[in-house]
């Protein structure tokens, strides 16, 4: 549990905010120096997501998506805008959202809102989104705040909507990264938080073809 590794919650959040302010507003910056894996990541995410957009009667709509921890819009640009009519972005770092407006180019006109906010304080508009995409950011929330955020996301879904978490998973327990002030949780810990938020796991997939030295990355589709 994060309560065992985070001594000071306020400092946990403020330190992360300070860390990201110093990160370059580039794809490489967003990916911690692993910019070269961006295409591998996006292509796998697209395949994972499309199975829900293609199904019959209960298929997920393609009108509105929300990109959480969006940074400069790497995922918005390459995954969400090509598949959805309108995208909203939320990120704690204002400079990233400013950069997004040029990085996204012409298609960026279909980004409706740029919310500058930490996810612990963010509430998606109820019944507004077909897909809420949460990638490489859950480690910046405490267990309690993550569960509460997921509950708010659940309320933010349109009929047949889904939440996707894509993130690093530890082998066991919870590991604190003191550099960027984040945690990495084991898959079973994330499952427990997901259940506590009243969500069910629809699908789960491990990301392939990533460098050996980084954590295993999993995608979880939830409703």
Curated annotation (Swiss-Prot):
Superkingdom, taxonomy of origin: Eukaryota
SUPFAM superfamilies listed in its UniProt record: S-adenosyl-L-methionine-dependent methyltransferases
EC numbers for this chain: 2.1.1.244
InterPro entries cross-referenced by the UniProt entry: MeTrfase_NTM1, SAM-dependent_MTases_sf
- By what name is this protein known? N-terminal Xaa-Pro-Lys N-methyltransferase 1
What protein family is recorded?
Belongs to the methyltransferase superfamily. NTM1 family.
The protein's annotated catalytic reaction(s) are: N-terminal L-alanyl-L-prolyl-L-lysyl-[protein] + 3 S-adenosyl-L-methionine = N-terminal N,N,N-trimethyl-L-alanyl-L-prolyl-L-lysyl-[protein] + 3 S-adenosyl-L-homocysteine + 3 H(+); N-terminal L-seryl-L-prolyl-L-lysyl-[protein] + 3 S-adenosyl-L-methionine = N-terminal N,N,N-trimethyl-L-seryl-L-prolyl-L-lysyl-[protein] + 3 S-adenosyl-L-homocysteine + 3 H(+); N-terminal L-prolyl-L-prolyl-L-lysyl-[protein] + 2 S-adenosyl-L-methionine = N-terminal N,N-dimethyl-L-prolyl-L-prolyl-L-lysyl-[protein] + 2 S-adenosyl-L-homocysteine + 2 H(+)
Q: May I ask which residue range the UniProt record assigns to the signal sequence?
A: none
Q: Which UniProt keywords apply?
A: Acetylation, Methyltransferase, Nucleus, S-adenosyl-L-methionine, Transferase
**Source species, please?**
Bos taurus (Bovine)
Q: Which residues bind S-adenosyl-L-methionine?
A: 69, 74, 91-93, 119-120, 135
Q: Does the keyword Methyltransferase apply?
A: yes
Instruction: Give the enzyme's main class according to its UniProt record, as a single word.
Output: transferase
Provide the gene name from the record: NTMT1
Checking PANTHER family in the record gives: AD-003 - RELATED, N-TERMINAL XAA-PRO-LYS N-METHYLTRANSFERASE 1
N-acetylthreonine: residues bearing it? 2
Q: Where in the cell is it found?
A: Nucleus
């Amino acid at each position: 549990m994060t309560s065992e590794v985070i001594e000071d919650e306020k400092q946990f959040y403020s330190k992360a905010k300070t860390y990201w302010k110093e990160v370059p507003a580039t794809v490489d910056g967003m990916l911690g120096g692993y910019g070269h894996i961006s295409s591998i990541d996006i292509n796998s995410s697209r395949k994972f997501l499309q199975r829900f957009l293609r199904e019959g009667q209960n298929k997920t709509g393609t009108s509105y998506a929300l990109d959480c921890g969006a940074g400069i819009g790497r995922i918005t640009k390459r995954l969400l805008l090509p598949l959805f009519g309108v995208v909203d972005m939320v990120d704690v770092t204002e400079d990233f959202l400013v950069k997004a407006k040029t990085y996204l180019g012409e298609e960026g006109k279909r980004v409706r809102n740029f919310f500058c906010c930490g996810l612990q304080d963010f509430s998606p508009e109820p019944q507004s989104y077909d897909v809420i995409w949460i990638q490489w950011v859950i480690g910046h929330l405490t267990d309690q705040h993550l569960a509460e955020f997921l509950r708010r996301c659940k309320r933010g879904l349109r009929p047949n909507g889904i939440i996707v978490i894509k993130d690093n998973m530890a082998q066991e327990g919870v590991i604190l990264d003191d550099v960027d002030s984040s945690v990495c949780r084991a898959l079973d810990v994330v499952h427990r938080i997901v259940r506590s938020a009243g969500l069910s796991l629809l699908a789960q997939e491990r990301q392939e073809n990533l460098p050996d030295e980084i954590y295993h990355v999993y995608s979880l589709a939830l409703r």
